[in-house]
Amino acid sequence: MSPSRINTYIDCPLKFYLQHVEGLKEDEEMTDFIDSATFGNIIHKMMQVLYDSASPKVIMAETIDSWLNNKAMIEKLATRIINEEYCHLKSDLDRELVGDTILIGKIVVYYVRQLLKYDKRIAPFEYKNSELASSKTRWLVGTHEFNYRQVIDRIDCVLSDDGDYLRIVDYKTGTDTPEVNSVDDLFDDTVASSKRKALTQLMLYCNFYVQDNVGYEQKQICPVVYKVRDVDAVLVNGNTFDVKIGKQTVTDYRDYNKEFMGKFTELIAELFDRNKPFVQTKNIENCKYCPFVEICGRDC
């Protein structure tokens, strides 16, 4: 089990069954340009390599300025990662970009620099990790045990005069708008997945991270979604990438966690209930781009 699989079940239990029980695969689509998943991987890796290279790991505004003032370094890094992730080269990663990869490189460099400008606003912060994978062979939720795995995009600790706090960061290069009216919305398939998926993921990340790491039981942990497409507007308007439930910014996942874990426990019980069939979603909007729509017979 993983956060993405749990979100699939919320979207449509039948899709979850076809994909993760029967093991049916989605057809890979041919695209003329870079697909969103590959673009997201490139952005993730760019940010990871930059922050992994930092020494010390306390990131000051001056640290970020040194990167922003060295555009050639960021361009070179983009070339290497595009050649690896998009062109699938195993060697000669410094090969000059040609054709559509030139445009991809310009877009990647632009967005990485914009994200760094945003990070400069929250500096100083202690960079802790990127692409942190963790798993458990028998995670007990309610009365059910299951294998679980997650990968957190980034973890850092903002150093503030008002008190330090940990951030669990998820980069999103799609159209996610993580803002729901209530915790119930996170488990409601009639609510647009773009509004609930990222926050559901982050709440699970926070829970499992605290269980997996000693010393964070009482520490403030803030879930954050870096919406890459929105970074320009965020910088211009002075906004943040914080997420909201109702009208309230989620500054600590614990403020909502008792209710969240209660609903999550109910969901897991439903998923493992042998008397509960895997039914179609009630929200036909979830079917529009489903690869299994012909199998289930839903008329979209």
Residue ranges and their predicted role:
Residues M1-C300:
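RecB-family 4Fe-4S metal-dependent nuclease core
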